Structure formats: structure tokens, C-alpha cells
Amino acid sequence: IEPFVQIIVQRSEAGELGSPGPQMSKFEVVTAMAFAAFADAPVDIAVVEVGMSGRWDATNVVAAPVAVITPIGIDHGEYLGESIGGIAAEKAGIIGAREGTDTVAVIGRQVPEAMEVLLAQTVRVDAAVAREDSEFAVLGRQVAVGGQMLELQGLGGLYSDIFLPLHGDHQAHPLRFGDLARSE
């Protein structure tokens, strides 16, 4: 990212970034720099985490065939609202129809209010759905030296003896999402 940081610094010092139009947030600048680095690399697959929302987030410019939504809670209430349904509606914005590609929504465990909103968005954009504990799940965990052994149910079948070098059930959740998103 260093070359992209230098471009921003040079343009800033030259006064080229102080235009009277809309200003980019630090997150938007860093996101744009990351996308430029991905294009320059190039990468085959990029895991891009949404900043705060989804609907208006800078990362939403990516034509992503897979959208992963982890469990939704009350966060950033001053920006996203104070209800789970309202927050879910904002976060559902990352599930979008992408021209020329099928969209898959990988959805983690949700309270019913959030799940209803997310599923409604998948219907609107005709996205396929994979829900935790329905289409995919961790079927078993065993403590192992240096981590844990997992048995996962994915869309493509059963995966046994998956070593995760981290301890705890909370560490197995992200692995499920990442493995499923990668397989899509």
C-alpha cells in the first residue's frame, strides 16, 4: 500500500485534495487505496470487510458474488438506528444484484427480526442463501494441541478433521463463513 500512501501524501501536500466538493472519510480513502492495491497486485479473491453499514459503505462498490453477514447486534446506533431490524436493513445493503453473476448470501445466526429483513433482501435481488445451522454448520469440535479439530457441514458436503489453530467455539464461527464463501 506504500505507493498509494505516497500518492495521497503528495497530492495532499500539493493542495490537490482540498477541493470544495464532498470530502472522503479516512475509511473511504483507505478503502480506495486497498482496491487500487488489489488491482495492482492483482488478486484472485479479496475478503473485504464492510466498515459500518453496508448500504452506503465505501466497500459496496465491489461487485461481490458472495456477501457474508455475521450475527447482527446493536452497534453504531447513532448512525444505523436503535432497532435490530433497522440495523439489519442497513447491513443487508451488501447483498446486491450483480450484473453477469449470481449472488450468494451467507448468513450467520440471527435473531428472527434480523433474519426476516436479510431474507427479504435476498428475495429482492434473487440471491441464493446459505444460513448457519441450516445449510452449513459446525457439527463437532474437539480440543487439540495448539487449537481444535472441527467437523463442518458445508454446501458441498461434510468436512472432517479440519484443524483450526485457535481455541474456542467463537473461533469456529468465522471459519465456517470463510470456508463457505471460498467454496462459492
Outline where the language-model segments fall.
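ATP-dependent carboxylate-amine ligase catalytic core
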Residues: 1-62, 74, 78-81, 86
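Beta-strand->loop->alpha-helix junctions that form or flank phosphate-binding loops
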Residues: 108-112, 121-144, 163-169
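Conserved catalytic-core segment of NTP-binding enzymes
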Residues: 51-126
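Glycine/charged-rich beta-loop-alpha catalytic/anionic-binding loops adjacent to active sites
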Residues: 7-18, 69, 156-164
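Gly/charged, well-structured mid-domain segments that form the phosphate/adenylate-handling core
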Residues: 130-140, 144-147, 154, 158, ...
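A conserved, hydrophobic alpha-helical segment in the catalytic core
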Residues: 28-42, 62-73, 112-117, 163-184
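Generic secondary-structure signature for well-ordered alpha-helical cores
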Residues: 3-10, 40-43, 92-96, 120-128, ...
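Short, flexible, mixed-charge acidic loops at enzyme active sites
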Residues: 62-66, 146-151
